[in-house]
UniProtKB/Swiss-Prot annotation:
<keyword id="KW-0472">Membrane</keyword>
<dbReference type="InterPro" id="IPR021854">
    <property type="entry name" value="WASH1_WAHD"/>
</dbReference>
<dbReference type="GO" id="GO:0034315">
    <property type="term" value="P:regulation of Arp2/3 complex-mediated actin nucleation"/>
</dbReference>
<dbReference type="InterPro" id="IPR028290">
    <property type="entry name" value="WASH1"/>
</dbReference>
<comment type="similarity">
    <text>Belongs to the WASH1 family.</text>
</comment>
<keyword id="KW-0009">Actin-binding</keyword>
<feature type="region of interest" description="VCA">
    <location>
        <begin position="331"/>
        <end position="447"/>
    </location>
</feature>
<dbReference type="GO" id="GO:0032456">
    <property type="term" value="P:endocytic recycling"/>
</dbReference>
<dbReference type="GO" id="GO:0071203">
    <property type="term" value="C:WASH complex"/>
</dbReference>
<dbReference type="GO" id="GO:0031901">
    <property type="term" value="C:early endosome membrane"/>
</dbReference>
<feature type="region of interest" description="Disordered">
    <location>
        <begin position="403"/>
        <end position="447"/>
    </location>
</feature>
<dbReference type="GO" id="GO:0016197">
    <property type="term" value="P:endosomal transport"/>
</dbReference>
<comment type="function">
    <text>May act as a nucleation-promoting factor at the surface of endosomes, where it recruits and activates the Arp2/3 complex to induce actin polymerization, playing a key role in the fission of tubules that serve as transport intermediates during endosome sorting.</text>
</comment>
<keyword id="KW-0597">Phosphoprotein</keyword>
<feature type="compositionally biased region" description="Pro residues">
    <location>
        <begin position="284"/>
        <end position="296"/>
    </location>
</feature>
<keyword id="KW-0967">Endosome</keyword>
<feature type="region of interest" description="Disordered">
    <location>
        <begin position="1"/>
        <end position="42"/>
    </location>
</feature>
């Protein structure tokens, strides 16, 4: 408002004479400075309007209870190209170019008159001692000045005002400051050890320093306990529409107890006994047993069995005799019949299915024996090539012992083949079938 009133007052008081003079002579430096002042004043007024607008917004927001999000730009809002700054005093003269008055002094120095000086010495006696003073042998400092000193800085001590040729102070970190003369400096020919430190001379024990730990150990610190209600109504300048979740996840401090998340549990598969094959979701019935051989031949040809196994075999033979007349022979049925309800029956059934015709890559015992012989020969050759040396023999024995302990050497079992042999040995023997059926089995395994 003050600016507008001043503009109106200026327009009312304007004279035509001044305008005519301005038109005739052109813009003066004073008028150019006035324009820049007006422009700066308008900029200040615009900034004031922005400030008042922001203040009004703040006053409007001050009493509300709603949460407000404020987004701020990363850069200050400014024009892409800044205006060049122009000085207000464009028409003013440079003060360095101004001429200043110079005054000449006509008086001169009077020449020195030696005669008048000699006459004054006659009237005013001056006593000057011309006798040389005796030199002090214990003079402090480094002695006389050398002839090659050309400046005061080379004469004085660095960054001080001390003249080393007059007084030289030697600083000893243990004994303190000692003033030495040039005679003492010349007399010091042999070096002496410094005094022992106080920790040795006075038998003082130094405290053991605890090593500092520079590793970062996060700490939650002391959290103040504030007992306030969950809902605080009618608080001034506090937003009441904020919603947050109490589950904020794990804390940032890894050393806090109880922050390790629990791992999910996995269901492990339980080893179940082998079952018979399923065809279309229905259990296949066991194949009908083949006609057994006559009982006297079985008893005559079979080896003597233990008493625990002889009774069930005899009972099975009698049952087979009763059912042999009614059940005809079926092609493809197994030649050996075992009680399907037992665990050995399921094991043998799985072995037959896994190692049937063309499924299992079985090796004969001859090939295994040949491989073992080759391995033994190679070990003997290595032993003979490295033999004759005590350390090599010890090394070979140690290797053989390690192989025996780990199960890879000759002293260990035969691996999975040996385990299978032990399982097959534990199965009770089955009476041998008829001769033609045994030949067919051998043909099937060989093919």
């Amino acid at each position: 408002m003050a600016f507008h009133e001043m503009q109106a007052h200026k327009n009312a008081l304007g004279t035509s004479g001044e305008q005519q003079a301005a038109d005739i002579t052109g813009p003066t430096p004073h008028q150019g400075g006035w324009k820049q002042v007006e422009q700066s004043r308008s900029q200040v007024q615009a900034i004031g309007e922005k400030v008042s607008l922001a203040q009004a917004k703040i006053e409007k927001i001050k009493g509300s209870k709603k949460a407000i999000k404020v987004f701020s730009s990363a850069k200050y809002p400014a024009p892409e190209r800044l205006q060049e700054y122009g000085s207000i005093f464009t028409g003013a003269q440079d003060p360095g170019l101004q001429r200043r008055p110079r005054h000449r002094i006509q008086s001169k120095h009077r020449p020195l008159d030696e005669r008048a000086l000699q006459e004054k010495l006659k009237d005013f006696p001056v006593c000057v001692s011309t006798k040389p003073e005796p030199e002090d042998d214990a003079e402090e400092g480094l002695g006389g000045l050398p002839s090659n000193i050309s400046s005061v800085s080379s004469l004085l001590l660095f960054n001080t005002t001390e003249n080393l040729y007059k007084k030289y102070v030697f600083l000893d970190p243990l004994a303190g400051a000692v003033t030495k003369t040039h005679v003492m400096l010349g007399a010091e020919t042999e070096e002496k050890l410094f005094d022992a430190p106080l920790s040795i001379s006075k038998r003082e024990q130094l405290e053991q320093q605890v090593p500092e730990n520079y590793f970062y150990v996060p700490d939650l610190g002391q959290v103040p306990e504030i007992d306030v209600p969950s809902y605080l109504p009618d608080l001034p300048s506090i937003a009441n529409d904020l919603m947050y979740s109490a589950d904020l996840g794990p804390g940032i401090a890894p050393s806090a107890p109880g922050t390790i998340p629990e791992l999910p549990t996995f269901h492990t598969e339980v080893a179940e006994p082998l079952k018979a094959d399923l065809q279309d979701g229905v259990l296949t019935p066991p194949p009908p047993p083949p006609p057994p051989p006559p009982a006297p031949e079985v008893l005559a040809s079979a080896p003597p069995l233990p008493p625990s196994t002889a009774a069930p075999v005899g009972q099975g033979a009698r049952q087979d005799d009763g059912s042999s007349s009614a059940s005809p022979s079926v092609q493809g049925a197994p030649r050996e019949v075992v009680d399907p309800s037992g665990g050995w029956a399921t094991l043998l059934e799985s072995i037959r299915q896994a190692g049937g015709i063309g499924k299992a890559k079985l090796r004969s015992m001859k090939e295994r024996k040949l491989e073992k012989k080759k391995q033994k020969e190679q070990e003997q050759v290595r032993a003979t090539s490295q033999g004759g040396h005590l350390m090599s023999d010890l090394f070979n024995k140690l290797v053989m012992r390690r192989k025996g302990i780990s199960g890879k050497g000759p002293g260990a079992g035969e691996g999975p083949g040996g385990a299978f042999a032990r399982v097959s040995d534990s199965i009770p023997p089955v009476p041998p079938p008829q001769q033609p059926q045994a030949e067919e089995d051998e043909d099937d395994w060989e093919s």
